[in-house]
């Protein structure tokens, strides 16, 4: 009992001492202010409400830290009487928040309840990003202010006997500074980036490029093994080829990014496809890498795609490491390939590495060359975040996942980002690295290849090569622009207080240092009147709706005079004309080259009920495939479908197969076609054709036309209607009018490279001339020849590569550039009729030199693919009304005379005549059923 009494006595004495200490501390500050010690130094800064009683200084650490006053606490502790130093500390932050939040009025006997109608604060909202927001707090490593205060604010208000409504009122007052406080301190950014720049010099971004079947995925497997990125239990061949189609066909379809750690280095590897139908994936990879491994098959040597890839790498001006793979083969021609690389590609012999990716021989040497030869990502001084999207995919839980390269700055969760092209804003939900599965992290830095998730569900908001920046940059730019315009319009300069001048000058001069102002000179100080000010929506410096006064004495009256701390200030905002606006488009990343579709066809769902599912599937596939495009199309026979663009027939087949496997939608595809440029004679334009032409109008300046007087043609085509006719572009042969309506048709040509052994050059020449190729040049590399032809795109789509392979016994290879030139051609529109009914989906365009051969081949294939019916089927090919090819499918036979085993012959004749009449009737009204996969078989869209 005695112990308890002594304990309570000691506790009471301790509480009294603490209270007395706080009371003395506050009274000391209050005494200096009330007795006008240095009042001229703070009179225009310490602004609060008028009260008849004494004042109380709010000094709760959580409150002050939340509003960036940690320096003020420190200064007050050291020099309690130096109010001038107190003000310098505020200004030296380059950040002046609402000062009503600094001083909270209280009665000496108790708290004054804060009523809404008595809310007469003089609020100064800065709305400008600051470079020194509470740097002491951040750099001390104690965490985020918001995280610290989130737990403590509610308890602080409760401890001060605020009720729930009062707490909410105070929280609403604090929202003025919420956005500003959340902006990262640029000094902190610089320190973080400086720390990371040391590590950034150990980052290497590179990709593996090669012709198909050269061992790219196998080399990537060895990289994963040697860096211990994947555990041995999980490791399997072609690990990065995660799609089932890739494993079945043994080809890479999509680029794959993976982050690996090797010793003290970070390797960001991108594995790319080798087939030229997916060449756009290679281009995207080169845009985000500082180096590339050029892999060559040791058994086959330099191939057509190897040459194209080398030229593409040279355009991007990045470091190339030549590597010869498959040296373990007995047929390896290492010396010959070395000579070709030295003579043709200007490599030095000591630069060329030889490895066996299958067995891992010499792969460690590749790592050393990556470290020494490939430069680290460029280090930029800009601290704001900027990144470029080079790939994306859809996750059913997280929405659209973006794969980006961080160009400068850093990005972390809960930051708000802005898409420059789509002008959309999102909040980051997750950031992380691909290892190769998604591994979340707290923050990503410049130079990193990483993924971000923002729960994006609208597919149209995202496009490849989109530039992402920190939303604060956009917000600050708009605020600076608004302040500049509003202050420029303002006639209110001379009535603003001295604090307003510091804010505006700091904003308009990119935050001049207010510490340089002489606050201690009190000679010849001017007197200004405190006038009634009301809220003006035009100003970015907001004023209270009530009357504002300045604390001067114990009792303050309206319209009283105070001393101005600055000398000779006649006009405020002298620097309001100086304003550097940030052009958001100027900070956008360079546009990534996008491969536009070269092959078009229509896709329809076999089940009309799944048309919506087909559209969703196409949207998701379009996310990570820049060369794939689609739009809605309506067909009379097949219903609603989609006109789709592809980069080749293999690309078409892959998309069709992915729709079937991943989205469970069976589809029908029409005949593949290319874009034709058509010029129509004006006198033959009817209303129907005119409506189509208006829909097809485009800027012909973006089209490369190979004609004698191309400039005059382009100038003529830019006008929608001219004396000679109109231009339009279409891939649908049904949109092309009759021959006599057309003045010219322009056909797309592409530059094609064919590499073959010298002994097969005659076969290659014959095949190219047969397909209307235009010879350009040929080059010799040892015993191989590189042919360059201008080939019609429509001719090389179907079976051309197969013919090259068969002509050269598998040693030849072919690739073409995705650069199209339109040449004038004599083309015919071929209609296919089945039982006198035109089948629009089978209509095609052919040249006058081979239209008969193509038509005969197509009709004979149709005859073999269509099953016999109970009536006669006639298949015809025609140009207009002129039928030049015809085939018949005989009807199924039924022995109607089998029951006539005797009697008069007239009975047998009557039964046969009745059968013939029925077949004639069925011929006119019967419908021919075409097999679902007829177009795939008809146009040889094979699984290559």
Swiss-Prot record:
Q: Sorted alphabetically, which Pfam families does this protein's record hold?
A: EFG_C, GTP_EFTU, LepA_C
Membrane disposition: Peripheral membrane protein
State its location(s). Answer: Mitochondrion inner membrane
Per UniProt, GTP binds at: 210-217, 271-275, 325-328
Matching PROSITE patterns, A to Z? G_TR_2
Q: GO terms for molecular function, please?
A: GTP binding; GTPase activity; ribosome binding
Q: What is its EC number?
A: 3.6.5.-
Q: Which InterPro entries match?
A: EF-4, EFG_III/V, EFG_V-like, LepA_C_sf, LepA_CTD, LepA_IV, P-loop_NTPase, Small_GTP-bd
- Catalysis: reaction(s): GTP + H2O = GDP + phosphate + H(+)
* Major subcellular location class: mitochondrion
Q: Give an example GO biological process.
A: translation
One further remark on this entry is: This protein may be expected to contain an N-terminal transit peptide but none has been predicted.
Provide the family line. Answer: Belongs to the TRAFAC class translation factor GTPase superfamily. Classic translation factor GTPase family. LepA subfamily.
**PANTHER family reported in the protein's UniProt record:** TRANSLATION FACTOR GUF1 HOMOLOG, CHLOROPLASTIC, TRANSLATION FACTOR GUF1-RELATED
Give the protein's function.
Answer: Promotes mitochondrial protein synthesis. May act as a fidelity factor of the translation reaction, by catalyzing a one-codon backward translocation of tRNAs on improperly translocated ribosomes. Binds to mitochondrial ribosomes in a GTP-dependent manner.
Q: What is this protein called?
A: Translation factor GUF1 homolog, mitochondrial
Q: Which organism is it from?
A: Plasmodium yoelii yoelii
């Amino acid at each position: 009992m005695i112990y308890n009494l002594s304990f309570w006595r000691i506790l009471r004495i301790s509480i009294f001492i603490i209270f007395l200490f706080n009371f003395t501390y506050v009274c000391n500050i209050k005494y200096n202010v009330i007795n006008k010690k240095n009042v001229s130094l703070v009179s225009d800064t310490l602004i609060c409400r008028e009260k008849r009683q004494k004042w109380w200084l709010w000094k709760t650490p959580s409150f002050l830290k939340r509003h960036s006053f940690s320096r003020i606490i420190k200064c007050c502790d050291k020099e309690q009487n130096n109010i001038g130093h107190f003000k310098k500390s505020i200004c030296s932050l380059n950040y002046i928040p609402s000062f009503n939040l600094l001083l909270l009025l209280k009665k000496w006997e108790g708290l004054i309840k804060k009523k809404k109608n008595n809310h007469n604060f003089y609020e100064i909202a800065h709305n400008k990003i600051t470079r020194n927001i509470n740097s002491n707090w951040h750099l001390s490593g104690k965490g985020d202010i918001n995280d610290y205060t989130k737990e403590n604010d509610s308890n602080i208000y409760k401890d001060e006997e605020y009720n729930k409504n009062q707490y909410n009122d105070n929280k609403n007052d604090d929202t003025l500074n919420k956005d500003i406080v959340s902006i990262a301190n640029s000094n902190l950014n610089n320190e973080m980036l400086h720390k990371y720049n040391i590590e950034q010099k150990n980052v290497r971004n590179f990709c593996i490029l090669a012709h198909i079947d050269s061992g790219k995925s196998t080399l990537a497997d060895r990289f994963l093994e040697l860096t211990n990125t994947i555990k041995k239990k999980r490791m399997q061949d072609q690990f990065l080829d995660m799609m089932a189609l890739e494993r079945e066909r043994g080809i890479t379809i999509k680029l794959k990014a993976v982050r690996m750690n090797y010793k003290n280095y970070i390797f960001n590897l991108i594995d790319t496809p080798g087939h030229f139908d997916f060449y756009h994936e290679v281009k995207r990879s080169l845009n985000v890498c500082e180096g590339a491994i050029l892999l060559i098959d040791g058994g086959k040597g330099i191939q057509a795609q190897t040459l194209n890839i080398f030229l593409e790498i040279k355009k991007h001006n990045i470091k190339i490491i030549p590597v010869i793979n498959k040296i373990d083969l007995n047929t390896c021609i290492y010396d010959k390939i070395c000579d070709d690389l030295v003579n043709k590609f200007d490599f030095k012999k000591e630069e060329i590495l030889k490895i066996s990716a299958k067995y891992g021989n010499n792969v460690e040497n590749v790592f050393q060359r990556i470290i020494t030869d490939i430069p680290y990502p460029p280090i930029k001084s800009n601290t704001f975040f900027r990144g470029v999207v080079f790939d994306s995919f859809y996750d059913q839980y997280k929405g659209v996942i973006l794969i980006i390269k961080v160009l400068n700055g850093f990005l972390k969760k809960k930051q708000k980002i802005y898409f420059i092209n789509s002008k959309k804003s999102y909040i980051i939900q997750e950031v992380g690295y691909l290892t190769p599965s998604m591994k979340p992290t707290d923050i990503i830095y410049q130079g990193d290849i990483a993924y971000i998730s923002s729960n994006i569900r609208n597919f149209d908001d995202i496009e490849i090569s989109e530039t992402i920046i920190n939303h604060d940059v956009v917000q600050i730019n708009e605020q600076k622009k608004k302040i500049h315009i509003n202050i420029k319009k303002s006639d209110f300069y001379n009535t603003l207080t001295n604090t307003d001048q510091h804010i505006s000058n700091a904003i308009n001069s990119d935050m001049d240092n207010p510490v340089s102002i002489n606050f201690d000179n009190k000679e010849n100080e001017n007197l200004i009147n405190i006038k009634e000010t009301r809220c003006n929506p035009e100003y970015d410096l907001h004023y209270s709706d009530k009357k504002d006064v300045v604390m001067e004495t114990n009792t303050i009256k309206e319209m009283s005079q105070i001393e101005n701390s600055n000398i000779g200030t006649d006009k405020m905002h002298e620097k309001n004309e100086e304003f550097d606006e940030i052009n958001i488009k100027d900070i956008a990343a360079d546009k990534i080259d996008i491969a536009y579709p070269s092959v078009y066809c229509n896709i329809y769902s076999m089940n009309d009920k799944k048309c919506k599912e087909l559209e969703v599937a196409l949207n998701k596939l379009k996310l990570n495939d820049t060369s794939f495009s689609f739009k809605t199309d309506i067909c009379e026979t097949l219903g609603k479908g989609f006109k789709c663009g592809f980069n080749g027939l293999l690309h078409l087949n892959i998309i069709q197969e992915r729709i079937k496997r991943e989205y469970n939608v069976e589809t029908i595809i029409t005949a593949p076609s290319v874009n034709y440029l058509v010029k129509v004679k004006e006198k033959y334009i009817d209303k129907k054709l005119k409506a189509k032409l208006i829909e097809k109008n485009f800027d012909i300046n973006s089209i490369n036309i190979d004609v004698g007087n191309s400039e005059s043609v382009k100038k003529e085509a830019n006008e929608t209607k001219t004396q000679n006719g109109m231009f339009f572009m279409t891939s649908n042969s049904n949109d092309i009018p009759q021959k006599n309506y057309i003045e010219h048709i322009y056909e797309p040509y592409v530059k094609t490279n064919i590499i073959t052994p010298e002994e097969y050059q005659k076969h290659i020449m014959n095949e190219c001339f047969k397909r209307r190729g235009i010879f350009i040049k040929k080059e010799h590399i040892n015993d191989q020849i590189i042919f360059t032809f201008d080939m019609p795109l429509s001719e090389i789509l179907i079976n051309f590569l197969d013919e090259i392979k068969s002509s050269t016994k598998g040693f030849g290879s072919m690739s073409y550039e995705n650069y199209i030139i339109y040449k004038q051609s004599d083309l015919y529109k071929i209609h296919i009729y089945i039982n006198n009914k035109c089948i629009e989906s089978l209509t095609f365009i052919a040249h006058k030199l081979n239209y008969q051969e193509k038509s005969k081949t197509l009709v004979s294939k149709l005859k073999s693919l269509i099953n016999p019916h109970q009536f006669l089927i006639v298949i015809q090919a025609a140009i207009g009304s002129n039928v030049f090819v015809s085939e018949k499918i005989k009807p199924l036979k039924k022995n109607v005379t089998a029951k006539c085993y005797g009697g008069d012959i007239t009975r047998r004749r009557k039964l046969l005549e009745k059968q013939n009449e029925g077949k004639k009737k069925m011929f006119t009204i019967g419908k021919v059923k075409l097999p679902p996969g007829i177009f795939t078989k008809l146009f040889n869209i094979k699984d290559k």
